[in-house]
């Protein structure tokens, strides 16, 4: 654990909600007007965001190593600057290749300013007391779509999609650059200097190349993919069940409410369980929810209730992912190890944006797609049950 700068936690929370709102949620909100203006399909526009997320996943390991050695101030400030440039390029994109290039550049920014680096900072700042602050950060970040979806929609209505991205670039610059530059300036030391040496690299590889690490990584990635692919497509799936559009849209909003509830309850859940028990419980609850959503056509009230449960599982899963490495291997070299750990989750989250609708079309409907996802998550739960009990994680 290292000394925390005054205002650092508040700055991280404000920067996270703004960065998520503008570098991630803005495009799903703007996809219809972008498509209507350019003639690019909705899938193509969404694929640009997915491509950026893949870049973020690839860069995650390198970003984690830099964070361990250099600290967050310069890294996250630079990420914000790159994000501003990316949004400006989105606004000025004259063609599809340039539009994709803009979102690929946004992927560089995402790798430096979204959850993984913020989780690493909080883990270093708070050490054994990290779960509460991590919960707070994800609760605030969880409201990014609530705050920025209507704001982006308003900006698009007033300025058009290109003008709105110019305004968003200004907002990102005015909010996140000062927060990262001025409030992440505390000492970055836990009493023992970080060793960017052969010895430190060997320690990192010993963890990241272990069977236990890779099995946990794969099962967590499966959970990320399946839960996201189903819940993000709640509206078309419920429409296929005969539900009204208004109720289906409300159900998607309630998935978000479920995420908040899950995150609020996670600290107590964590105190009462072991890392393996938490993982298995979250996976089983998620699989059960997906099976019900896949196989039960009615009653609608039950489908909505299960959608909320699925949201709660996603909320818990976010914090489960944030603490998986530190709970098992401690906080030494956390940035590098966690960067390697979450890279597949970031990648499959990007793929799920387009894989869900694609599988639904291939299989003949969203319920059939949900069956596949439920089966995959069930398998992940069975594998997670076999994880050996970890040794107590050393305190930093």
Predicted regions and their residues:
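Extracytoplasmic
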Residues: 8-42, 60-63, 149, 230-235
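Extracytoplasmic gate region of multi-pass secondary transporters
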Residues: 27-31, 210-264
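Cytoplasmic helix-loop-helix junction between adjacent transmembrane helices
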Residues: 103-139, 330
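Helix-loop-helix hairpin linking two adjacent transmembrane segments in secondary transporters
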Residues: 137-188
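C-terminal transmembrane helical hairpin of 12-TM major facilitator-type secondary transporters
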Residues: 255, 259, 265, 272-324
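A late C-terminal transmembrane helix in Major Facilitator Superfamily
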Residues: 328-363
